[in-house]
């Protein structure tokens, strides 16, 4: 069996496992439950079909750059929906030590992916909105577009910081589904000199969906 065949077989086996998983929910609420598995729950809103590959739970590791130097982190991203015209987004990460073990909590963000709805401007209606609240004390609004069926690019349009929040610059993010069905991304942020510099990157494997 060639390496390519082995990769396909491994992906198929992984899909059989992840397809049976979903995020936990409380079953007594009188509204559609969140689901991170497109095989279960409400149908995905047609307005979100260009974001369909993102739905799921993703886990993996990445690299970050901070003032004290580079570091490695683990991360889980949950992308779910309830049939509405938005995707729920929750990302949390943790620092890893030199042995690849948990060291301490890291960055955390939560928010929503939406498409701009402007019947008067069909081109603008293809724009993505990503609204994020960060545990470090700031709120961020991204706008972007799908680059193709499996990659998306977004850039910060507005940023608001609380009095206790971290001082940060705007960012540019690129997400994509890559070889093996993994989710990869890179984030650049504006530094003190006003230029975009590498900040975060990660490769995550599907865990649910």
UniProtKB/Swiss-Prot annotation:
It is an enzyme of class 5 (isomerase). Its cofactor is heme b. The keyword Metal-binding applies. A motif (GXWXGXG) lies at residues 56-62. Pfam families: THAP4_heme-bd. GO terms for molecular function: heme binding; metal ion binding; peroxynitrite isomerase activity. It catalyses: peroxynitrite = nitrate. Homodimer. PANTHER family: PEROXYNITRITE ISOMERASE THAP4, THAP4 PROTEIN. Heme-binding protein able to scavenge peroxynitrite and to protect free L-tyrosine against peroxynitrite-mediated nitration, by acting as a peroxynitrite isomerase that converts peroxynitrite to nitrate. Therefore, this protein likely plays a role in peroxynitrite sensing and in the detoxification of reactive nitrogen and oxygen species (RNS and ROS, respectively). Is able to bind nitric oxide (NO) in vitro, but may act as a sensor of peroxynitrite levels in vivo. Forms a 10-stranded antiparallel beta-barrel structure able to accommodate a hydrophobic ligand in its interior. In fact, this fold hosts the heme group, which is located in a wide surface cleft. This is Peroxynitrite isomerase 2. It comes from Mycolicibacterium vanbaalenii (strain DSM 7251 / JCM 13017 / BCRC 16820 / KCTC 9966 / NRRL B-24157 / PYR-1) (Mycobacterium vanbaalenii).
């Amino acid at each position: 069996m060639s390496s390519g065949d082995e990769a396909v077989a491994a992906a198929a086996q992984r899909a059989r496992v992840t397809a049976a998983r979903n995020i936990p929910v409380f079953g007594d609420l009188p509204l559609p439950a969140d689901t991170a598995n497109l095989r279960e729950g409400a149908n995905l809103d047609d307005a979100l079909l260009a974001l369909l590959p993102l739905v799921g739970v993703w886990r993996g590791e990445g690299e970050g750059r901070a003032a004290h130097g580079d570091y490695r982190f683990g991360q889980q991203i949950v992308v779910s929906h309830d049939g509405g015209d938005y995707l729920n987004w929750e990302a949390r990460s943790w620092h890893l030590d030199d042995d690849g073990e948990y060291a301490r909590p890291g960055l955390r963000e939560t928010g929503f992916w939406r498409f701009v709805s402007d019947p008067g401007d069909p081109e603008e209606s293809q724009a993505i909105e990503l609204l994020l609240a960060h545990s470090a004390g700031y709120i961020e609004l991204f706008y972007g577009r799908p680059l193709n069926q499996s990659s998306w690019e977004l850039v910060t349009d507005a940023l608001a910081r609380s009095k206790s929040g971290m001082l940060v610059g705007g960012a540019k993010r690129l997400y994509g589904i890559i070889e093996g069905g993994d989710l990869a991304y890179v984030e650049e942020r504006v530094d003190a000199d006003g230029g975009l510099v590498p900040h975060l990157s990660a490769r995550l494997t599907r865990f649910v969906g």
